[in-house]
Amino acid sequence: KIAMVLWRGETNVEQGFRAYFDENSIPVDLTIYDTARDLSRVPAIIDQIRKDPPDLVYTWGTGITSSVVGKYDAVDPAQNITDLPVVYVMVSSPWKTGIAAPAGQSRPNVTGATHIAPLAAQINAIRAYRPMDKLGVVYNSREDNSVSNVADLTELGREMGFEVLAAPLGTDGEPSQDDIAPAVAELARKGADILYIGPDNFIGNYRDTLTDAGFANGLAAFSATELEVRDGHAMLGLVSRYELVGRLAASKVEQILIDGISPADIPVETLDRFSYLIRLSSARKLKLYPPLSLLDYAEVIE
C-alpha cells in the first residue's frame, strides 16, 4: 500500500511507476493525495497518512518532499514523516536542498530518484547546437532548487567560459506571470544567446509565456526538464524521460517493500542516460536549424 503525494496530479512519472509494477506482476494499492500546486495542503495530508499508515510514501518534487521528510539535519518528528519509508521523484538537487544527506551519510527512511542531467552536460548540449557565451535565466527566487541551480550554473560558467545573466522573479513578493516577458526582453538586450529553463515549478507553469517572449526577442529556450520541450515550445533540452524516472523510483520501492532493503542502503540516483530533444517547430520559428550531426542521436519532435 503506497501513499502518493503529488504536486499537480498524475504525470508521466506516475505512469512509468505504475507500469513497472504491472509488468513485474507486483500488486500495489495506490492512494493519491494531490496538493494541486499548494504546499499548504501538505500538513493535512501528513495527518491523513498517519491515521491510516501505508507501507511507503511516494513524494513528487522538492517542495512536497522537503515538507514531508524535512532536511536531513533538521527533522521534526511532529511535522515530518520519520517512521515510514519515503521514496521521492523529481527533486532536482537533493543534496543542495538538504533532502539527501551529504556523501558518506544516509537517511534512515528516505531515498529517491533525481532527474536532472549534470550541468556541464547540459551546457555541452547547448553548445552542440550553437555557440553560447551568455546564458539567460529567468527563475523564481522563492524556490530553493532554482536558486541553487543558478548558483551552480554561475560557478560552472567560470570553468566553462560563459556568463550567466540572471533575472530573478519574486524578490519583493510572489512572482507574477506578468514579470516574465519584460525579464526576457531585458536578457535579450543584455546579449543573451539562449534562455535556460531549469527545474523551476513557477516557470514550468508559465513555460509558454517564457518561450513566447523568447520568440518575440529572437531567443531560443533550452530546458533541463522534459515537459518544456515535449509539451511546450523550448527548442531543445537534455532531459530525463519522466516515464523512466517513475520506473527508477518503482525499482527502489520494490527493493524496500519486496526485498526488505532499508532506504538508508539504497542510493539516490539519476538515470544513466539522458534524451536530447529538439522541437523543430521552434527551430523553424527562430530559423535556428540543428546541425546535422545532432540528428544522429537527438529525438526530433515536430
Predicted stretch roles:
Residues 1-302:
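Short hydrophobic alpha-helices and adjacent helix-cap/hinge residues
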